[in-house]
Amino acid sequence: MPQPGSSVDFSNLLNPQNNTAIPAEVSNATASATMASGASLLPPMVKGARPAAEEARQDLPRPYKCPLCERAFHRLEHQTRHIRTHTGEKPHACQFPGCSKRFSRSDELTRHSRIHNNPNSRRGNKAQHLAAAAAAAAANQDGSAMANNAGSMMPPPSKPITRSAPVSQVGSPDISPPHSFSNYANHMRSNLSPYSRTSERASSGMDINLLATAASQVERDESFGFRSGQRSHHMYGPRHGSRGLPSLSAYAISHSMSRSHSHEDEDSYASHRVKRSRPNSPNSTAPSSPTFSHDSLSPTPDHTPLATPAHSPRLKPLSPSELHLPSIRHLSLHHTPALAPMEPQAEGPNYYNPNQPHVGPSISDIMSRPEGAQRKLPIPQVPKVAVQDMLNPSGFTSVSSSTANSVAGGDLAERF
């Protein structure tokens, strides 16, 4: 009977071993699964362990309940994210230029941003191309809309500038604003619009021949509308013959401005034609009486030029003192560049003081001398002028002037 006893004893021994072997086998299986996780078997273990974790979390309280449905959540951010599924809110917008996608979850935005940040992704390249094309199309639409708005808004401001002479932003004659010549040409084209309609349709630049023809024709027809016979002969004839284009442009502005003034303004010119403004004032503070500048024929009520008694063309219009000032001074009635391309060449180099006689031999005479010792420039002779003559307004500084009170004294008394 040893076999049955041994068998019974063996079976008794196996029963408790079988009962205790079940958790041991489970622990061994868990240990083997843990060891196998190091051998790239981690996803099956996680999938197998996820239900256990979810079962463990099922026991936790869910205080955050959705007000729109029966779902409850452990954390507040989970409830907020769930509510966005009902409302359709997408607060997370893609910051990539040209991309207009929005997401309700931050992790979706992070996943989407990898498409733009990964240059090797085909989808990312396609999305970038589409985004760039959309951005370019939007920019083109905005540019065309701005161009249309600018084109529709450009003609109205030019009309009051052409027809009348308001208190505008025209600079003073001693300051040349740094505008381009295209603005100068457009302004001139608008001033000559009644006489040269074809130049108004040009996109850029100006036909000088057309301007000269139109201005010369108007000069012949209406030259006696501003001055008497002798005065118009002095102002129009010799100055147009010697100066050319600046006088034509000045006449064009004067004619366009004079249409907005009555005959009373033209008659009052005879009494106020010597009136000047203070030297340092950028704009005129006097009433809008037609005061004439240095080399223009237009009444300019918006500003008056600097006081230049020695260079006044009305005092001695035929004397060489007309060439004292550069031609930019009389081209600054409107927006002119610092050096206008339409500036004609001067008649002579005597810009300094034409009253001084030429003393000493010329350079050609010095260079033609045979001896080398005689080929030397003479010492320049400085004219001896007394201090009283320099300080006196009617002295050396205003040789050709016939009025001494036209700088800042007498004109202020007349003005007030």
Swiss-Prot record:
Keywords: DNA-binding, Metal-binding, Nucleus, Repeat, Repressor, Transcription, Transcription regulation, Ubl conjugation, Zinc, Zinc-finger. One of its GO terms (cellular component) is cytoplasm. It is found in: Nucleus. A zinc finger (C2H2-type) spans 64-86, 92-116. GO terms for molecular function: RNA polymerase II cis-regulatory region sequence-specific DNA binding; zinc ion binding. Induction: Induced during growth on suberin. Its main location: nucleus. Residues 230-242 have a biased composition (Basic residues). It holds the Pfam family zf-C2H2. SMART domains: ZnF_C2H2. Residues 279-293, 395-409 have a biased composition (Low complexity). The keyword Lipid metabolism does not apply. Residues 1-21, 145-179, 220-321, 340-368, 395-416 are annotated as: Disordered. InterPro entries: creA/MIG_C2H2-ZnF, Znf_C2H2_sf, Znf_C2H2_type. GO terms for biological process: chromatin remodeling; negative regulation of DNA-templated transcription; pentose-phosphate shunt, oxidative branch; regulation of carbon utilization. Belongs to the creA/MIG C2H2-type zinc-finger protein family. Transcription regulator component of the regulatory network controlling carbon source utilization through ubiquitination and deubiquitination involving creA, creB, creC, creD and acrB. Represses the transcription of the alcR, alcA and aldA genes by binding to a GC-rich region in their promoter. Also plays a role in response to carbon starvation and the control of extracellular proteases activity. Interacts with creB. This is DNA-binding protein creA. It comes from Emericella nidulans (strain FGSC A4 / ATCC 38163 / CBS 112.46 / NRRL 194 / M139) (Aspergillus nidulans). The gene is creA.
